[in-house]
Amino acid sequence: MTQHFIVIGNPIAHSKSPEIHTLFGTQAGLDICYQRQYCPDDAASFTAVIEAFFHGGGVGANVTVPFKQIAYECCAARGGLSEHAKVAGAVNTLLLNKALLAKGVPPVEALFGDNTDGQGLVNHMQRLGWPLNGARVAIIGAGGAARGVVLPLIEAGIETLSIANRTVSKAEILVDELSTASEKINQHTIQTYATADLSGDFDIIINATSIGLSGETLPLTDKLNCQYAYDMMYGRELPFLQHFSIRGAQTSDGYGMLIGQAALSFERWTGRAIDVAQATTALENVST
């Protein structure tokens, strides 16, 4: 029997998720149908699309911009949230709470939300061989992308964490909110800086902003150094990575994170683990 999945967003035509998950299905030996689903940008439309999909037998859905917070609110009022979703304040993976289904709760009232973005980032760094345990890490950006990766990084054993943002007050607010949301984070001291004031030696620096996609550059000082630089964006030459590459750092964009978070979603839905390295090679061969 074919298992049905969707990715919901606006815009959505650019999404690589159908190709990625179709490959996962082939690797796992499962008959799946994964489609893009456009949705008008409002909560009522999102709820209607989700309810129709799961009422019709859908197995799982991915959620992308601008609906991750709406999905969070929807699941919080229904089937629940994972710890990572609670801390991130956003949901990128929808599935059904089997315990509630077993009690006779209708599928649309058993929606459960997870967030696999941060773990996808951590898993990609681990596949690259980047040392996270004991690492000194800095994140540039204090928006939703940064929020979603803090807990997985701490769970991976990093030693210190600094968060920098053009407006330092936004970084301070983020740290306060994260510390309130998670005892694991509350036990970890996080330093905050204005991006232009971030300096010193770090093992890993992560760009969690989209500035590079617009051709802008971050106000990085020459006194800021790292061994590894990671940009969560992908798909073009990124000034952030160029800045650190010429200074001798190993660099990576976020394409591996995209595949990693997708693999985790697929495993949540189907119970099948994906060989991400094999899948990445296959996808790279298809795109070249």
Swiss-Prot record:
Keywords: Amino-acid biosynthesis, Aromatic amino acid biosynthesis, NADP, Oxidoreductase. GO terms for molecular function: NADP binding; shikimate 3-dehydrogenase (NADP+) activity. NCBIfam families: aroE, PRK00258.1-2. Its EC number is 1.1.1.25. The keyword Amino-acid biosynthesis applies. InterPro entries: Aminoacid_DH-like_N_sf, NAD(P)-bd_dom_sf, SDH_C, Shikimate_DH, Shikimate_DH-bd_N, Shikimate_DH_fam, Shikm_DH/Glu-tRNA_Rdtase. Belongs to the shikimate dehydrogenase family. It catalyses: shikimate + NADP(+) = 3-dehydroshikimate + NADPH + H(+). Involved in the biosynthesis of the chorismate, which leads to the biosynthesis of aromatic amino acids. Catalyzes the reversible NADPH linked reduction of 3-dehydroshikimate (DHSA) to yield shikimate (SA). GO terms for biological process: amino acid biosynthetic process; aromatic amino acid family biosynthetic process; chorismate biosynthetic process; shikimate metabolic process. The gene is aroE. It is an enzyme of class 1 (oxidoreductase). It comes from Psychrobacter cryohalolentis (strain ATCC BAA-1226 / DSM 17306 / VKM B-2378 / K5). GO terms for cellular component: cytosol. It comes from the Bacteria. Shikimate binds at residues 15-17, 64, 92, 117, 234. NADP(+) binds at residues 83, 141-145, 165-170, 232, 254. The active site is at 68 (proton acceptor). This is Shikimate dehydrogenase (NADP(+)). Pfam families: SDH_C (PF18317), Shikimate_DH (PF01488), Shikimate_dh_N (PF08501). Pathway: Metabolic intermediate biosynthesis; chorismate biosynthesis; chorismate from D-erythrose 4-phosphate and phosphoenolpyruvate: step 4/7. The keyword Transmembrane helix does not apply. Homodimer.
